[in-house]
């Protein structure tokens, strides 16, 4: 199983939100580059970065920070948030990003998504963020009428190889991942799944590993030290 330490960017800082609420923000590190270096130092093999400002604005607003992170670490970095054109995708790849995560565009601009997948194949990941089972977009501010399962099936048909699935109600809560929704997703599509939201303990990670989930994104649990990065990397290596 792949472990993805998370860095959420807002106004150039590393923050955590509670259930996706921008008003419920906690600054975890004023220097996201330093945080990325810390994660790499403790053994991280890859990083997950979200441009929260970009997700709302519809364009990358923390590109310079992302570029500095990519230059500061030697591990692959995947980035999501506000990426809604091929130009934006290419710009991220040009500054050193390894994989790009598309969210809102996956729902509302299938032509762009298809072109991106055709050009970059497995380098394009789709982020599906669900609120009460329905897909949320534009920084989780809008909730659509399409279920996360239906969107996942559409993504599979387009050729997407990896999905990041987030249950918004779990995000930043340390309440444990939504196992039921992940199990249903596994039964519905044969795409690699990266679980995000609510992971609070080594036991949560082991449970996801036992389900053969491809990867897990860990944010708040690392910052609040309910999960030790070195320990979870060792545990998943042995599983």
Swiss-Prot record:
It is an enzyme of class 5 (isomerase). It is found in: Cytoplasm. Gene3D superfamilies: Aldolase class I. GO terms for cellular component: cytoplasm. Pathway: Amino-acid biosynthesis; L-histidine biosynthesis; L-histidine from 5-phospho-alpha-D-ribose 1-diphosphate: step 4/9. It catalyses: 1-(5-phospho-beta-D-ribosyl)-5-[(5-phospho-beta-D-ribosylamino)methylideneamino]imidazole-4-carboxamide = 5-[(5-phospho-1-deoxy-D-ribulos-1-ylimino)methylamino]-1-(5-phospho-beta-D-ribosyl)imidazole-4-carboxamide. PANTHER family: 1-(5-PHOSPHORIBOSYL)-5-[(5-PHOSPHORIBOSYLAMINO)METHYLIDENEAMINO] IMIDAZOLE-4-CARBOXAMIDE ISOMERASE. This is 1-(5-phosphoribosyl)-5-[(5-phosphoribosylamino)methylideneamino] imidazole-4-carboxamide isomerase.
């Amino acid at each position: 199983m792949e472990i993805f330490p998370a860095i959420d960017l807002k106004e150039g800082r590393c923050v955590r939100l509670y259930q996706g609420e921008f008003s419920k923000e906690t600054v975890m590190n004023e220097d996201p580059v330093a945080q990325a270096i810390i994660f790499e130092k403790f053994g991280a093999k890859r990083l997950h970065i979200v441009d929260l400002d970009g997700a709302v604005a519809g364009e990358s607003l923390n590109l310079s920070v992302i570029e500095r992170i990519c230059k500061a670490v030697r591990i692959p970095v995947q980035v999501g948030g506000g990426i809604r054109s091929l130009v934006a995708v290419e710009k991220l790849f040009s500054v050193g990003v390894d994989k790009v995560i598309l969210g809102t565009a996956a729902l509302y601009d299938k032509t762009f998504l298809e072109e991106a997948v055709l050009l970059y194949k497995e380098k394009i990941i789709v982020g599906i963020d669900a609120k009460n089972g329905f897909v949320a977009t534009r920084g989780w501010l809008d909730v659509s009428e399409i279920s996360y399962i239906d969107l996942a099936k559409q993504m599979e048909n387009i050729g997407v190889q990896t999905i990041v699935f987030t249950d918004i109600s779990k995000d930043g809560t340390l309440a444990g991942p939504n196992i039921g929704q992940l199990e249903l997703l596994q039964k519905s599509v044969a795409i690699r799944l990266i679980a995000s939201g609510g992971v609070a303990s080594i036991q949560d990670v082991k449970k996801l590993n036992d389900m053969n989930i491809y990867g897990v994104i860990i944010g708040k649990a690392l910052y609040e030290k309910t999960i030790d990065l070195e320990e979870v990397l060792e545990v998943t290596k042995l599983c």
